Amino acid sequence: MKLFGWMQNKLNGKQGNKKPNTVPITTHPAKQEPREEFSDWPHGLLAIGTFGNNDLKENAAESQDIQEDPTSSEEILDNFTPEEVGKLHKELTKLLTRKPNIEKEIADLPLDRFLNCPSSLEVDRRNSNALCSDSADDHKDEDIEKTISVILGRCKEICGDKNKKAIGKKSISFLLKKMFVCRSGFAPQPSLRDTLQESRMEKLLRVMLNKKIINPQGSSRAASMKKYLEDRQIPTKKESNTEDDTKEKINNGCKWVKTDSEYIVLEI
């Protein structure tokens, strides 16, 4: 507005310089013309971006009319009786309560059922989730059973070790009685060498028995061979004895006997 006043003053000043006598006559219409020209500018500025809607003026006029006539609404309300107002209130409540029923009826339509029904992928996903939950429960049960079996096995091992160490659990009095009453005392534990030797001897005896049982002819042949060898060795011994006797006789054929005076040869 200051800009407009400054422009008007400029225009009025120029006209005043040209026509000093007509200044009071031209001042009033010059001020009124720009007001009429720029009176529509606020509505035009507000209408920018509304694609040329000119309803702003009409809406502003209607709002002004409503503000100017507040008595019209009061007159309309005065025309209704309290009974009519109560009936309207009841009807409004009925309409409001019917809305959810209408929504249910719309949802029951076949098209809505088709659109709202779960897809096959969703059904598969639900089934897979259910199966996964069942499998997880099964795995938990299996883990529990495994832990129980491990615990039982460990308990059995501990019990076996305790049974093996029964002597260590006996009381000192029992051990002393056993040592003093029994002369032999505790039997010594067999060494590894004895066990190995016994096992080897047992194997040899088994082999010998098997041979005797399976090959009795072989054993008889061996006995006959021993007898034959013994018979051959006996005559050889006799022959050697005779040879020794002959040698002694030859050597003892003549002997020198020494006396005080001379040697005498004795012939045998």
From Swiss-Prot:
Alphabetized UniProt keyword annotations: Growth regulation
Top-rank taxon, per record: Eukaryota
Tissue: Expressed in roots.
Segments for region (Disordered): 11-39, 220-246
GO biological process: positive gravitropism; regulation of growth
Claim: Zinc-finger is one of the keywords in the record: no
InterPro entries xref list: LAZY
Biased composition (Low complexity): 11-21
Motif (IGT motif): 44-50
Basic and acidic residues compositional bias, start-end: 30-39, 227-246
UniProt function note: Involved in the development of the root system architecture by influencing lateral root angles and primary root length.
Note: Plants overexpressing DRO1 exhibit increased length and density of roots, and increased biomass of shoots.
Family named by the database record: Belongs to the LAZY family.
Protein name: Protein DEEPER ROOTING 1
Gene, per the UniProt record: DRO1
